[in-house]
């Protein structure tokens, strides 16, 4: 079976809009809900939501490719590059800095047309600390670019991309298709959603880089949505994709074998809906965090504030296992008796809720 780039009528994708209508309508409602809430937020709170979403996207788009970074490394780089803090100690992980800078760059230029120069710049940012990959350059090897799995002697080829010698023309065709794409069947937002999903598939099919295609492809998805909707979209698609990576790869593999892409669009819009729902949770979390500090900040000592900041920094996923006396001692470099006294005070003030008892005692923030 041929891959779609080998078909004479590529990239004339076909899909059944009747199977997308309900999903697009749900997406439109969620986008409207998020926009409405964000309009009521101050610029500071909007930046907080943006940072939380970019943090999730940076970490999860990397984890999909097998790269793991600490939340602290990525968050500190994001906050400094966004100008939300003046200075942080340099990150020990330069690749964490790189993915953070990519996230900011993608969103900063959301209203500019997608171009080859833009994508090459993203790739240069992403790969600038890799000595084995030339950042900002298309692949040039005469060897086939294949997506494979298995061990030596038992290799399975999942996909073979176009030869590198054809990439210049193929990318010209991609950007021309992108600029001229029209489908008003499902409205303006529906058109943006469809174009973003197809752009992701199209780019992944060309696979123009030696490495980083997945991360750039997912960045393109969010860039296209924001550009066509004419406003930044606060969403992390990779956080939803990462929950079931095998499904993601299976859907791409299937879509690269037929120009009938209804299933790919259904999958992509379902991921979008999940991402939008996650954003609603992030917005609610940021609001509760703000209300919490407005109410309790003056009642906290420095140790308590440091521990609570640590808990909030874990985002909507929460502080795994809750706060414990042992963790409190470690965070503050203090004694167990001081930790016990501080924690009890937080319970007495209804700031913490005690969970369990004895050695298994832990504490959760009371955000009700």
Predicted segments with their positions:
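FIC/Doc superfamily catalytic core
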Residues: 1-368
């Amino acid at each position: 079976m041929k891959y779609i780039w080998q078909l004479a009528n590529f990239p004339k994708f076909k899909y059944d809009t009747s199977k997308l209508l309900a999903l697009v309508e749900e997406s439109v409602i969620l986008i409207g809900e998020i926009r409405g809430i964000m309009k009521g937020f101050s610029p500071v709170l909007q930046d907080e939501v943006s940072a939380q979403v970019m943090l999730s996207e940076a970490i999860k788009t990397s984890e999909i490719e097998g790269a793991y970074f600490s939340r602290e490394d990525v968050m500190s780089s994001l906050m400094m590059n966004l100008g939300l803090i003046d200075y942080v100690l340099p990150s020990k992980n330069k690749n964490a800095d790189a993915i953070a800078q990519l996230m900011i760059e993608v969103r900063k230029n959301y209203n500019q047309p997608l171009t080859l120069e833009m994508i090459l710049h993203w790739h240069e940012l992403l790969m600038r600390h890799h000595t084995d990959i030339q950042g900002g350059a298309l692949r040039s090897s005469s060897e086939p670019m294949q997506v494979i799995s298995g061990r030596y002697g038992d290799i399975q080829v999942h996909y073979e991309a176009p030869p590198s010698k054809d990439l210049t023309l193929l990318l010209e065709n991609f950007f021309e298709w992108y600029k001229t794409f029209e489908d008003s069947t499902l409205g303006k937002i529906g058109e943006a959603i469809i174009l973003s999903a197809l752009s992701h598939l199209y780019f992944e099919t060309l696979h123009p880089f030696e490495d980083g295609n997945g991360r750039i492809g997912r960045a393109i998805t969010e860039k296209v949505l924001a550009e066509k909707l004419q406003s930044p979209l606060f969403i992390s698609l990779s956080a939803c994709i990462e929950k079931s990576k095998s499904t993601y790869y299976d859907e791409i593999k299937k879509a690269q074998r037929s120009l009938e892409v209804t299933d790919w669009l259904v999958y992509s819009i379902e991921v979008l809906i999940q991402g939008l729902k996650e954003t609603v949770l992030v917005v609610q979390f940021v609001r509760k965090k703000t209300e919490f500090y407005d109410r309790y900040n003056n009642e906290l000592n420095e140790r308590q504030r440091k521990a609570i900041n640590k808990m909030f920094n874990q985002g909507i996923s929460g502080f795994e296992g809750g706060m414990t006396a042992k963790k409190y001692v470690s965070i503050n470099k203090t004694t167990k008796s001081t930790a016990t006294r501080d924690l009890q005070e937080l319970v007495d003030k209804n700031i913490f809720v005690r969970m369990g008892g004895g050695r298994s005692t832990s504490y959760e923030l009371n955000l009700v």
